[in-house]
Amino acid sequence: MQGSKGVENPAFVPSSPDTPRRASASPSQVEVSAVASRNQNGGSQPRESEDPQKSTEPSPPSSTLPASDEPPGSQLSELEEGPCGWRNFHPQCLQRCNNPKGFLLHYCLLALTQGIVVNGLVNISISTIEKRYEMKSSLTGLISSSYDISFCVLSLFVSFFGERGHKPRWLAFASFMIGLGALVFSLPHFFSGRYELGTIFEDTCLTRNSTRCASSTSLLSNYFYVFVLGQLLLGTGGTPLYTLGTAFIDDSVPTHKSSLYIGIGYSMSILGPAIGYVLGGQLLTMYIDVAMGQSSDLTEDDPRWLGAWWIGFLLAWLFAWSLIMPFSCFPKHLPGTAKIQAGKTSQTHQNNSTSFQHMDENFGKSIKDFPTAVKNLMRNTVFICLVLSTTSEALVTTGFATFLPKFIENQFGLTSSFAATLGGAVLIPGAALGQILGGVLVSKFKMKCKNTMKFALCTSGVALMLSFVFIYAKCENGPFAGVSESYNGTGEMGNLTAPCNANCNCLRSYYYPLCGSDGVQYFSPCFAGCLNSVSNRKPKAYYNCSCIERKVDITSTAXSPDFEARAGKCKTQCSNLPIFLGIFFITVIFTFMAGTPITVSILRCVNHRQRSLALGVQFMLLRLLGTIPGPIIFGVTIDSTCVLWDINECGTKGACWIYDNIRMAHMLVAISVTCKVITIFFNGLAIVLYKPPPPGTEVSFQSQNVVVSTITVEEDLNKIENEG
């Protein structure tokens, strides 16, 4: 072997028209490419060894190769494996993290932070933000959707250009944007001034004058744009995390371990909302203006109470920015990536439209290549089927994640806070467990692409059978005065106003349910005709109620007045809650067990160079067809079961107060089963259409085009033999 640069191979670094150069390659790298070339040439030459270490011709160690005459940093190969650090600073302590497990740890922390902010703190703070900044629900709904809008717009471009870039540095950028988004989201608190308490509202029958219709505007609602900006920044940070980060993990580990690592990473993004809800819930018990203190007579039960929603976003900002430095120190590829890729075999779906044979090694560097790359992906029928199956599943999962607490609250007569706690206790652990189990099973049995899709099909089938649990969870509505029950035989059905409360001028926009001693539920103390209350009792008690027929005294204390109603809903006679929660928990596990296998199948069925873009297309369509319309479809469906609407003094319809429980259960079953059937159909179609490549086909990782790499390596080998 002669020369000062060893074996030259332009396949490792795409040539540039301005500065054409050839990067050095070790003999082991040459042999890996040579083996791939023999496979691509139809096996005309016998294959010597799959392992570069077992070559019949001994290779000298890389340390014996002469040093390059090129300046430092100029001989970078496409596989830039190296130590952890920055430029020439590589502390030994950082090298312990320079492996897949070290990267996975930081990936999980960032995914956890993103989940805490986007799906935890934002959701639990929405109602507080509505009250503090006097916004309508339509505006806060747009705030929530801004994250998905940003993700959809950027996912394709980030995944396309980031595929050839330095993925860990992209994740450092993601950490910066997630932290910045959390910081911006908290800024309105610091610029809106001190929260001003209004007068307490007592909704008893005070024989007051009717409230006039008045509309007012507030400058506080202009902070809406700041919240939207924060969500857009969060979406910008989330895009590289779930596209480039997932592809980097898949690069760095063997095929059979990829599903395990991806499953663990995705499970952290699911546990994030749980932590966000717990953290946000605790912070909401603190008064909003922490530094100024609170009034001594103001408690959490007061309708005027607002919690310190903003503190959690500041904590997330600091934690996200603490991950910027760790991600920036990782090399472009972890040590050992080339050896791992050399041992992988291709599972790309084979047909005439997905060959992705581009003769230009610079393909993918220019925006002009973007339409061609997307068009190539869209022609991959297996990929499209898998994406459509995930969008259908995302529609139903996001719908249930949004409205499951409402379903539990109305079906079983629970408070909204307790219903939300039960919903989170079922959804989040079940989803995380399902993601991990799916990844573990695929990894343990070393499933190929087709078997992975079959596994996802089976888990979706089990989830379909369990979806009928909502039929058995249905509970009939209890008696409600003015809705399903008359006021002691007076008044009209469907009208909350009756002769017993006609002079009270009650507000229908103020829903404060109470249970009468007659077992009937009333809309509010005012509509029950109650004149007095005792607030030092838990729950609050009311008496002198003209609309309640006295039957049984709630209290047995002789010295106390005759209480006729207590605050809160009447207890339901439905006892199916434990069974429903148990079966639904199992349903969630099987639903999310298909998540990781489908992601792995998408990574396998597309060209190796298009994995990041494939994930970008998947997440874009998943949001456009799944997570964005999902809550809307569920919301419209649930609203169709409403029997009593909030109508204010201006005649404007607001939220729904009472639902038809039986109809709601049937409608949710219909949506769930329909989406599951669509998921199973496209999953099964992907299995039927999938055509694996010939056995032994290796993954082309080091160049855009295997043919170009093959010809170049053979020319270099011939040159060496002639010189030798």
UniProtKB/Swiss-Prot annotation:
<keyword id="KW-0597">Phosphoprotein</keyword>
<feature type="transmembrane region" description="Helical; Name=9">
    <location>
        <begin position="447"/>
        <end position="470"/>
    </location>
</feature>
<feature type="compositionally biased region" description="Polar residues">
    <location>
        <begin position="25"/>
        <end position="46"/>
    </location>
</feature>
<dbReference type="GO" id="GO:0015711">
    <property type="term" value="P:organic anion transport"/>
</dbReference>
<dbReference type="GO" id="GO:0006811">
    <property type="term" value="P:monoatomic ion transport"/>
</dbReference>
<feature type="topological domain" description="Extracellular">
    <location>
        <begin position="123"/>
        <end position="141"/>
    </location>
</feature>
<keyword id="KW-1133">Transmembrane helix</keyword>
<feature type="disulfide bond">
    <location>
        <begin position="500"/>
        <end position="530"/>
    </location>
</feature>
<comment type="function">
    <text>Mediates the transport of organic anions such as steroids (estrone 3-sulfate, chenodeoxycholate, glycocholate) and thyroid hormones (3,3',5-triiodo-L-thyronine (T3), L-thyroxine (T4)), in the kidney. Capable of transporting cAMP and pharmacological substances such as digoxin, ouabain and methotrexate. Transport is independent of sodium, chloride ion, and ATP. Transport activity is stimulated by an acidic extracellular environment due to increased substrate affinity to the transporter. The driving force for this transport activity is currently not known.</text>
</comment>
<keyword id="KW-0406">Ion transport</keyword>
<feature type="modified residue" description="Phosphoserine">
    <location>
        <position position="15"/>
    </location>
</feature>
<feature type="transmembrane region" description="Helical; Name=7">
    <location>
        <begin position="377"/>
        <end position="398"/>
    </location>
</feature>
<dbReference type="GO" id="GO:0043252">
    <property type="term" value="P:sodium-independent organic anion transport"/>
</dbReference>
<dbReference type="Pfam" id="PF03137">
    <property type="entry name" value="OATP"/>
</dbReference>
<feature type="modified residue" description="Phosphoserine">
    <location>
        <position position="16"/>
    </location>
</feature>
<feature type="domain" description="Kazal-like">
    <location>
        <begin position="494"/>
        <end position="549"/>
    </location>
</feature>
<feature type="transmembrane region" description="Helical; Name=12">
    <location>
        <begin position="673"/>
        <end position="690"/>
    </location>
</feature>
<feature type="transmembrane region" description="Helical; Name=8">
    <location>
        <begin position="419"/>
        <end position="442"/>
    </location>
</feature>
<keyword id="KW-1015">Disulfide bond</keyword>
<feature type="topological domain" description="Extracellular">
    <location>
        <begin position="399"/>
        <end position="418"/>
    </location>
</feature>
<keyword id="KW-1003">Cell membrane</keyword>
<dbReference type="GO" id="GO:0008514">
    <property type="term" value="F:organic anion transmembrane transporter activity"/>
</dbReference>
<dbReference type="InterPro" id="IPR036259">
    <property type="entry name" value="MFS_trans_sf"/>
</dbReference>
<keyword id="KW-0221">Differentiation</keyword>
<feature type="disulfide bond">
    <location>
        <begin position="515"/>
        <end position="547"/>
    </location>
</feature>
<feature type="topological domain" description="Cytoplasmic">
    <location>
        <begin position="443"/>
        <end position="446"/>
    </location>
</feature>
<keyword id="KW-0217">Developmental protein</keyword>
<dbReference type="Pfam" id="PF07648">
    <property type="entry name" value="Kazal_2"/>
</dbReference>
<keyword id="KW-0472">Membrane</keyword>
<dbReference type="InterPro" id="IPR004156">
    <property type="entry name" value="OATP"/>
</dbReference>
<dbReference type="GO" id="GO:0007283">
    <property type="term" value="P:spermatogenesis"/>
</dbReference>
<dbReference type="GO" id="GO:0016323">
    <property type="term" value="C:basolateral plasma membrane"/>
</dbReference>
<feature type="topological domain" description="Cytoplasmic">
    <location>
        <begin position="1"/>
        <end position="101"/>
    </location>
</feature>
<feature type="topological domain" description="Cytoplasmic">
    <location>
        <begin position="691"/>
        <end position="724"/>
    </location>
</feature>
<feature type="topological domain" description="Cytoplasmic">
    <location>
        <begin position="604"/>
        <end position="612"/>
    </location>
</feature>
<comment type="similarity">
    <text>Belongs to the organo anion transporter (TC 2.A.60) family.</text>
</comment>
<feature type="modified residue" description="Phosphoserine">
    <location>
        <position position="26"/>
    </location>
</feature>
<dbReference type="GO" id="GO:0015347">
    <property type="term" value="F:sodium-independent organic anion transmembrane transporter activity"/>
</dbReference>
<feature type="transmembrane region" description="Helical; Name=3">
    <location>
        <begin position="169"/>
        <end position="193"/>
    </location>
</feature>
<keyword id="KW-0744">Spermatogenesis</keyword>
<feature type="transmembrane region" description="Helical; Name=4">
    <location>
        <begin position="219"/>
        <end position="249"/>
    </location>
</feature>
<feature type="topological domain" description="Extracellular">
    <location>
        <begin position="194"/>
        <end position="218"/>
    </location>
</feature>
